[in-house]
Amino acid sequence: MTNLQKRISSGLVLLVILAVIINATRLMPNIPVYTLVILALLVSYEYSRFFKTKSLSLMFLLTILMSTLVPSEYYSHFVILGCLIWLSLFLRILLYDNPTMGSAEIFFSGYLMIFPSFVSGIIIFESYAKLLMLVLIAVSFADSAAYFFGKKFGRRILLKNTSPGKTLEGLIGAFIATPIFLALLSTLMDINLSGAIIFGMIITPLSFAGDVVFSFIKRSANVKDSSNLIPGHGGFIDLLDGSIASLPFFALLLMNLPENF
């Protein structure tokens, strides 16, 4: 089985599990929230392994755990912080030739990416559960499409010092293929066609940014993969990096839509 086939198979299995979980809300209304908690803890554990000392790893995990006690009325602040940290890190990668991060930056950046993504998932689920599923499906497809087109046609590397596997051809291929895929999917998920196409055009660069930023952090920490739990991907961070980046932006959008939208 090729690496692409492994990536697609692993992604499909996890998406089926997610679909079952979301549909199980009729019997257990809080099961998606529990799932988000488990995923956040798994991602946090993998991220904690980026640190060279056990004390920093433990402190990071405790910080994430203690943050779950934050009252929900403060979630919007974390969503905004999450969007800002993603934008600042991605711009840093674009503007500087060979950026790097120290342990303190890795610590605070990780916290301001992972916890805001967790609360964003809760906000999205409570507002429009279908969007949570759509984000994960679209990111998984965009990631696989970029990998396929990059392997098949890739010639021009976009960020050789940060993420040498990312090519212009792969990004363009995903940017074209993802809206088409979501347009076909829109009939199955009862989604507006034009909305699905626009969504696909937005999700592709967000997924790309998530992948690149986590590659930057892993390179700074001298880590190749977050773990080896998921065939074809590596770990949960490697699988969900695009979703972790995308969720705060869509949560921010939902928070600012008119009530009767």
What are these regions (language model features)?
Residues 142-145, 172, 210, 237-245:
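Membrane-embedded alpha-helical segments of transport systems
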Residues 55, 220-243:
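Interfacial loop-to-transmembrane junctions
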Residues 1-167, 171-202:
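Membrane-embedded alpha-helical bundles of polytopic integral membrane proteins
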Residues 218, 243-250:
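C-terminal transmembrane helix pair
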Residues 113, 176, 227, 244-245:
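Hydrophobic alpha-helical transmembrane segments of integral membrane proteins
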Residues 141-151, 206-219:
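Short helical (or helix-break) motifs at transmembrane helix termini and adjacent helical loops
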